[in-house]
């Protein structure tokens, strides 16, 4: 999974940016380049040697012309200025590097030493490599990226359909108060898998830049409510009450893990289970956070008060409008919204 801080740097060289235009022109001309992005060039006077000082406004055309010289180029971090051209960059030679070519060895060492972005363009292989801190990212061809993203979105659509199906089945079981831990874990696992795919393809979409607008729209549409639903499920089914922030942490931990086991998800929810077979034997009751927020449209801040009074969704569903009005923040309108939304959901699920 590509870290968010690296994704932010990949945006600098995405198609549609002036910097990417220059890099593509450099590759097409069969040139090489070494580009160092800095906040203040004076900080790096011991590293930047020779060359000449420009301090001129950045443009793709200027960068392309300057790349015809052998030396490196120093730009401002916001890609608005060209500070130096034709310089010799001298990072600490004792910093370990796994690269072989001189340009790429310098780039890796420089990024590790300064924590800044360094871009190397290989003349021989026509490849753009971005180095940042201890990270390296090799820029992909647009055709490859589009193919990769298209496949991933197709997979996401199937996962979202399955996730929605599991949620629908869970709703039926919730209304009948016969949910097992296995049902909850199965639904959470599918949601975690869905978000993991999103995290894996996000760098590709960022790298596509303007070419990825449609993919970004599709991704947003497919996943806009998944995070919230998973957080609410964790809040509903944790063995001990957890707030939204704690539930968010649990969700994020599992999105980062590859193929989390049903046992690990169960234990994160606070259940002491040793074998997967046990999950079918553990009956659990929803607190009602998800239904209150997504079906009855009750704000989570008020939902806390409802759950605090009634404890479970089963008890909420049995409460009268008058009972519900006793909750702080619940008036006639919200009480009826809760009561009627649960009744409507029961009727809809019964008729399906």
Curated annotation (Swiss-Prot):
Q: What class of enzyme is it?
A: transferase
Its GO biological process annotations read:
DNA repair
Catalytic activity field: 2 ATP = 3',3'-c-di-AMP + 2 diphosphate
Say which domain of life the source belongs to: Bacteria
Q: Which PROSITE patterns match?
A: DAC (PS51794)
Q: Does the keyword Cell inner membrane apply?
A: no
Question: Where does this protein hold ATP?
Answer: 71, 89, 102-106
Keyword DNA-binding applies: yes
According to the entry, every stretch annotated as the DAC domain falls at 3-143
SUPFAM superfamilies registered for this protein in UniProt:
RuvA domain 2-like, YojJ-like
EC nos = 2.7.7.85
Name the Gene3D superfamilies on file: 5' to 3' exonuclease, C-terminal subdomain, DNA integrity scanning linker region, DNA integrity scanning protein, DisA, N-terminal domain
By its UniProt entry, which InterPro entries does this protein fall under? DisA (IPR050338), DisA_sf (IPR038331), DNA_integrity_DisA_N_sf (IPR036888), DNA_integrity_scan_DisA_link (IPR018906), DNA_integrity_scan_DisA_N (IPR003390), DNA_integrity_scanning_protein (IPR023763), HhH_motif (IPR000445), RuvA_2-like (IPR010994)
The stretch of residues making up the signal peptide is none
- GO terms, molecular function: adenylate cyclase activity; ATP binding; catalytic activity, acting on DNA; diadenylate cyclase activity; DNA binding; hydrolase activity
Write down the Pfam families for this protein, in alphabetical order. Answer: DAC, DisA-linker, HHH
Which family is this protein grouped under? Belongs to the DisA family.
NCBIfam families, sorted: PRK13482.1 (NF010009)
> What quaternary structure, including any partners, is listed in this protein's UniProt entry?
Homooctamer.
Query: In UniProt terms, what function does this protein have?
Result: Participates in a DNA-damage check-point. DisA forms globular foci that rapidly scan along the chromosomes searching for lesions.
Name of the featured protein: DNA integrity scanning protein DisA
């Amino acid at each position: 999974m590509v870290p968010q801080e690296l994704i932010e740097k990949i945006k600098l060289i995405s198609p549609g940016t002036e910097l990417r235009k220059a890099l593509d022109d450099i590759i097409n001309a069969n040139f090489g380049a070494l580009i160092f992005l800095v906040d203040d060039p004076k900080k790096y006077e011991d590293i930047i040697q020779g060359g000449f000082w420009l301090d001129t406004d950045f443009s793709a055309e200027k960068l392309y012309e300057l790349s015809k010289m052998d030396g490196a180029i120093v730009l401002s971090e916001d890609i608005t200025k060209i500070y130096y051209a034709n310089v010799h960059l001298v990072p600490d030679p004792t910093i370990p590097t796994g690269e072989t070519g001189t340009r790429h060895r310098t780039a890796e060492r420089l990024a590790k030493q300064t924590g800044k972005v360094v871009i190397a363009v290989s003349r021989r292989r026509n490849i753009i490599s971005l180095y940042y801190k201890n990270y390296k990212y090799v820029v992909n061809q647009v055709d490859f990226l589009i193919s990769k993203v298209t496949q991933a979105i197709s997979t996401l659509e199937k996962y979202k359909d399955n996730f929605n199906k599991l949620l629908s089945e869970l709703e039926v079981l919730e209304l009948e108060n016969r949910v097992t831990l296995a049902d909850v874990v199965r639904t959470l696992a599918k949601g975690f898998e869905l978000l993991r795919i999103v995290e894996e393809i996000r760098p590709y979409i960022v790298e596509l830049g303007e070419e990825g607008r449609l993919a970004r729209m599709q991704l947003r549409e497919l996943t806009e409510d998944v995070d919230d639903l998973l957080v609410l499920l964790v809040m509903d089914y944790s063995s001990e009450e957890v707030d939204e922030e704690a539930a968010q942490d649990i969700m994020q931990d599992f999105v980062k893990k590859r193929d989390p086991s049903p046992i690990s998800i169960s234990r994160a929810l606070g259940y002491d289970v040793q074998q997967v077979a046990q999950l079918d034997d553990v009956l659990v009751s929803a607190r009602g956070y998800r239904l209150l927020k997504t079906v009855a449209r009750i704000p989570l801040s008020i939902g806390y008060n409802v759950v605090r009074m009634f404890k479970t969704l089963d008890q909420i569903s049995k409460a009268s409008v008058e009972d519900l009005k006793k909750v702080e923040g619940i008036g006639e309108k919200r009480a009826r919204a809760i009561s009627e939304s649960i009744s409507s959901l029961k009727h809809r699920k019964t008729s399906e």
